[in-house]
Amino acid sequence: KIDYVAIETYNLYNGEPMTLIMAESRINAYLKADQECKEGDLLPFDKEKKQCPWRIVDRMKGTELEGMRYEQLMPWVKPCEKVDDFAPKFVTEYAAAHPEKVFASEDGRDKFVEMESEAFRVILGDYVTTEDGTGIVHIAPTFGADDAKVAKDANIPALYLINKKGETRPMVDLQGKFYLIDELDNNFVNACVDKEAYAHHAGDY
């Protein structure tokens, strides 16, 4: 069991106020003990003097964070899953309950379901430690077998692209470059891609 804290502090890059969550035992790895505000209001941020005050505003267990939703960091593409005989039960059930989110690939061979509402939430895991990091682990289902299993067990859909051949692909190609819109399946783009936002990054490394 890991004890977590909510900390009120500032963004070191722009000085904007923010609240972060981390394992209590990892505070000293990221924040200076002499800048903690134990009483009263949070002191102002001072970039020149490298003063970044902070204070603990709440304490919680990991179980209290389970199910909490968060905003997608780069919301250009919505998660989706393939709907076929090999799809996990949570995918087929979601597709049956939300037929308006089901779409076919351009060639009509495969069906997929957009699943944004089921992603971006906190799950629990016995693999999380406080030896390093913040005590919070980011899971990406398309980046390795371990992440894929954890996500599948927790009913978390994957985030990938679908090309003109109807093939699922990671967010970048083998050169680490974002795919061009024209290289992607039109039906997938219409269902899952914010074309205006994605266009700023298409073709970039």
Across the structure, where does each feature detected by a protein language model lie?
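Non-cofactor substrate-recognition interfaces
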Residues: 1-205
